[in-house]
């Protein structure tokens, strides 16, 4: 018999999945081409990968019933960045595209918040 925490985890996963599907529909309305949904590789996971006008967008979606903003940690950002590099290494046709990392918050109480260029790859300066 499943435990209560298993139901809770299932509810959170379902809510997250629904949030991702809503963002995909939103992106398609804005004429983005969805490349991957829930992309997984040995280095991590990316919720949505899309492109439009030679720009590749890696998207993290946070969904909540009531919270307006759910923080994304530096560790999560780093994991998404590594996964994005992995994706590009195996999909060379996107190598010349500009890259952007977006964050979408979706809450039933406050609606949709989009943060384009939510973070960037740290630039290394050699002296």
Curated annotation (Swiss-Prot):
InterPro entries: Restrct_endonuc-II-like, tRNA_endonuc-like_dom_sf, UPF0102_YraN-like. One of its GO terms (molecular function) is nucleic acid binding. It holds the Pfam family UPF0102. SUPFAM superfamilies: Restriction endonuclease-like (SSF52980). HAMAP family: UPF0102. Belongs to the UPF0102 family. NCBIfam families: PRK14683.1 (NF011276). This is UPF0102 protein ERGA_CDS_00540. The lineage of its organism: Bacteria, Pseudomonadati, Pseudomonadota, Alphaproteobacteria, Rickettsiales.
